[in-house]
């Protein structure tokens, strides 16, 4: 059986990516990161997802991106943008209405350069580099990552150009590449809408109740329903005609 490394955050996209990896006949080796993100709930979600899909090898790498900051996800001084901080009343607390705004492209949680404050500088570059090292050690020639370039937050490291560049790097900077063995960076969700990802997950039997997407969950771990990630998730489920099974505030 072919072996593959799967980047697993515990979110909706990475869970579907893991399921696709298994469907395609790979033995998945999941890799998650405790990188100084605000909430350890992400790691717990990744562990639940991995267990539900009977992943035998799930590694959790600890790195600290808080040393750089620069993102609302790693720097407590930068607030995670939420719609209810810009609007008032019941409308601001309605995740379905917020999801509709997300689907129509009204997300405006960006810096002056257009990049959202929730972008973690070089995160996918770092994660893929770790995955590349892991793949070399276990003899895997495939790395799966759940990035999406259709319904996404505008992160520069979720674009096809970035993946193509990293694919080239993988061929130049590894023992396998020098030996003429191609290391493949696979992004099966890249051209799918969030609704299509949800439908694919349903078809593959993904238990979305185990996943976590929220950037700013409540103390009881309920999703806020108002951050960028929640809005994209809710819009995807709504458009797919599927009920989102997680709890919202």
Regions found by a protein language model. Name each.
Residues 1-204:
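ATP-dependent adenylation/nucleotidyltransferase module used to activate substrates
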Residues 154, 222-223, 228-249:
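Iron-sulfur (Fe-S) cluster-binding segments and ferredoxin-like electron-carrier domains
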